[in-house]
């Protein structure tokens, strides 16, 4: 008899338990699942023509190449990449003078990546930020390694490259949004001979380095490309293989040659060093090699 009562109680318990589960399932109106994603900083993107933003599909240009057609290694740090650095040429028909004189630079040759068509535009620098680092700021600066010098060791000791113009572009933001966030060449020096400018200093001359492009707000440039074009009022539509297919002098960059340097009728050259500084440096997660 006791066994029958116990079995009956167990059966009742099971039936009640199942009934409770069915009732619970019938009354459940919603449930949750999860989703997740983790990012690491991106690889080097394409070089693009400096254009007013926001614009993600700008014209793609060739990488900076050496004389053998190989890509030139450019500074990078934690997903922040220098995309383009300029070579400055001031032409080969400059007349010497008894006075201090400024010689304008000639526009720089750039090439479309797909068609290899050339066009010429003012000198520029470009930095892409795919760091994914919300705290990152960065600065690109330049210094001239030594005075202009000829093969027979004649030097232009006090000759300096001067920058007279600046236009900033960014692929995520229009120019108005860049104010006080993107800075660069200060154009804060003047003399009686020319308009305001900034000079590229010579190393070892206690002149420091010249900042040419800087993001001053943490994370502002993440997922974008920023350019500084050394010309006031630069508009990208003015430069193309159809419109500017030959080099020409322009006023944004000039070489200031004092009479005291006594320039000779010969070719002078120099080298420039460009440095990228990133804070706080490498982001938390980086691609594995």
Residue ranges, per PLM feature:
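Bacterial Sec-dependent N-terminal signal peptides
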Residues: 1-8
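Bacterial N-terminal signal peptides
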Residues: 11-17
């Amino acid at each position: 008899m006791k066994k029958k009562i116990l079995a009956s109680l167990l059966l009742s318990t099971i039936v009640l338990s199942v009934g409770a589960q069915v009732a619970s399932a019938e009354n459940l109106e919603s449930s949750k699942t999860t989703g997740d994603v983790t990012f690491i900083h991106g690889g080097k993107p394409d070089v693009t023509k400096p254009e007013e933003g926001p614009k993600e599909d700008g014209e793609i240009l060739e990488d900076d190449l050496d004389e053998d057609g190989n890509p030139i290694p450019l500074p990078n740090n934690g997903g922040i990449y220098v995309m383009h650095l300029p070579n400055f040429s001031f032409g080969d028909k400059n007349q010497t003078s008894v006075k201090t004189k400024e010689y304008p630079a000639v526009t720089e040759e750039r090439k479309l990546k797909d068609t290899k068509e050339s066009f010429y535009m003012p000198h520029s620098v470009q930095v892409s930020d795919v760091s994914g680092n919300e705290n990152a700021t960065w600065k690109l600066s330049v210094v001239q390694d030594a005075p202009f010098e000829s093969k027979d060791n004649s030097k232009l000791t006090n000759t300096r490259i001067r920058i007279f113009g600046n236009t900033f572009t960014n692929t995520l933001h229009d120019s108005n949004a860049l104010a006080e966030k993107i800075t660069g060449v200060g154009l804060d020096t003047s003399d009686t001979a020319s308009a305001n400018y900034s000079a590229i200093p010579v190393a070892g001359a206690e002149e420091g380095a010249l900042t040419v492009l800087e993001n001053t707000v943490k994370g502002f440039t993440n997922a974008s490309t920023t350019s500084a074009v050394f010309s006031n009022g630069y508009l990208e539509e003015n430069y193309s293989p159809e419109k500017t297919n030959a080099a020409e002098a322009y006023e944004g960059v000039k070489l200031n040659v004092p009479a005291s340097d006594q320039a000779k009728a010969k070719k002078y050259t120099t080298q420039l060093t460009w440095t990228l500084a990133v804070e706080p440096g490498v982001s938390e997660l980086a691609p594995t090699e």
